[in-house]
UniProtKB/Swiss-Prot annotation:
Gene: metK
Name of this protein: S-adenosylmethionine synthase
Annotated source species: Desulforamulus reducens (strain ATCC BAA-1160 / DSM 100696 / MI-1)
Annotated residues for binding of Mg(2+): D17
Subunit structure: Homotetramer; dimer of dimers.
Catalytic activity field: L-methionine + ATP + H2O = S-adenosyl-L-methionine + phosphate + diphosphate
E.C. number: 2.5.1.6
Metal-binding is among the record's keywords: yes
Length: 397
């Protein structure tokens, strides 16, 4: 079999782009908790001592945005001014407008209802909030049906945050990144080739101490022992020093970690980010639906790997296209799988929102460590409740 390497990365909740994502989703959750029908497109920019929140929000409630921002920053761990970013003292600026009425009229009443193609009741008067394509993916490499490299990178990033917050490693600061290179024998993971951990730290801690702790208390604590061998490389803070970090070291923006948020590069991406967007935005809801579909296809045994593409036009409820690729692993043809998908999944925005119960404040928890394959969270798009029906209708035992 051919041997090949594949690499994926993750970042901790203290990474500046993830700080921005979490602020945007914390604001979204705070609004949805009071007004589930709100329209939210919330973008965040963070830099040294400053948070700027902008976007378009239409809702029937009041949310204290600066308070939400500060609470989120403090929860992440930026609690002292010497970190260059502190939730108590940073400036918070807001520039919020209402959703464009031109967009709203397309979302509020879908094209099919206007032209009589279907009843307004059937589509719940919701058209897609924008055009675009979204991808979902699943593979049988891991129990959560995610690619192994991104799964391991997220697991290490969560562990890195855990040892900081619990004091197991008391010199760490919030910013950090992980990266895992997995060697494949054909399509099966065979070993871990390279592990990279970069973590912000107290200025007086030496690199050898950091290296020892990161290998023993982070990497080897969570990586599968059977995949680590004497040739596995561990690269810890390769530059030698990582004291200045977080928004003080790099500006952060909502939506700049879309590959970390999804499949670590193992599948294609439509380009749309998730955080700060209410579920009428198909960038988010349809990407969740595509994952839900792909995961159920793999869980049903219809394929070992499955990538689903959905595409939408603004103001139109039904997807303009549904595409499936199983990379030669299908137990049935891709055409049969598409037919099963069309019969078992309602992929109109209203149908997605209803079936996955997306008008709830459930988004902040997804804004770090990935939106998919999260055994630590109860996410509706990770459910495999359609697998039995798909398997039965496909005629598989």
């Amino acid at each position: 079999m051919s041997r090949k390497l594949f690499t994926s990365e993750s970042v901790t909740e203290g990474h500046p782009d993830k700080v921005a994502d979490q602020i945007s989703d914390a604001i979204l959750d705070s609004i949805l908790a009071k007004d589930p029908m709100a329209r939210v497109a919330c973008e965040t920019f963070v830099t040294t001592g400053l948070v700027l929140v902008g976007g378009e929000i239409s809702c029937q409630c009041y949310v204290d945005i600066p308070k939400v921002v500060r609470e989120t920053i403090l929860e992440i761990g930026y609690t002292r001014a010497k970190y260059g970013f502190d939730g108590d003292t940073c400036a918070v600026l807001t520039a919020i407008d209402e959703q464009s009425p031109d967009i709203a009229m397309g979302v509020d009443k879908a094209l099919e209802a206007k032209t009589g193609e279907t009843t307004e009741a059937e589509i719940e008067a919701i058209g897609a909030g924008d055009q675009g394509m979204m991808f979902g993916y699943a593979t049988d490499e891991t129990p959560e049906l995610m690619p192994l490299p991104i799964s391991l990178a997220h697991t290490m990033a969560r562990r890195l945050s855990e040892v900081r917050k619990t004091g197991i490693v008391d010199y760490l600061r919030p910013d950090g990144k992980t990266q895992v290179t997995v060697e494949y024998d054909g399509d099966k993971p065979s070993r871990i080739d390279t592990v990279v951990i970069s973590t912000q730290h107290h200025p007086e801690v030496d690199l050898e101490t950091i290296r020892k702790d990161m290998i023993e208390k982070v990497a080897l604590h969570v990586l599968p022992a059977e995949l680590v061998d004497d040739k596995t490389r561990f690269l810890i803070n390769p530059t030698g020093r990582f004291v200045i970090g977080g928004p003080h070291g790099d500006a952060g923006l909502t939506g700049r970690k879309i590959i970390v948020d999804t499949y670590g590069g193992s599948a294609r991406h439509g380009g749309g980010a998730f955080s700060g967007k209410d579920p009428t935005k198909v960038d988010r809801s349809a990407a969740y639906a595509a994952r839900y579909v792909a995961k159920n296809v793999v869980a049903a045994g219809l394929a070992k790997r499955c990538e689903v593409q959905l595409a939408y036009a603004i103001g139109v409820a039904h997807p303009v296209s549904v595409r499936v690729q199983t990379f030669g692993t299908g137990a049935v043809s891709d055409e049969v799988i598409i037919d099963l998908i069309n019969r078992h999944f309602d992929l109109r925005p209203a149908g997605i929102i209803k079936s996955l119960e997306l008008r709830r404040p459930i988004y902040k928890q997804t804004a770090a460590y990935g939106h998919f394959g999260r055994p630590d969270l109860d996410l509706p798009w990770e459910c495999t409740d359609k697998a039995d029906a798909l398997r039965a209708e496909a005629g598989l035992k």
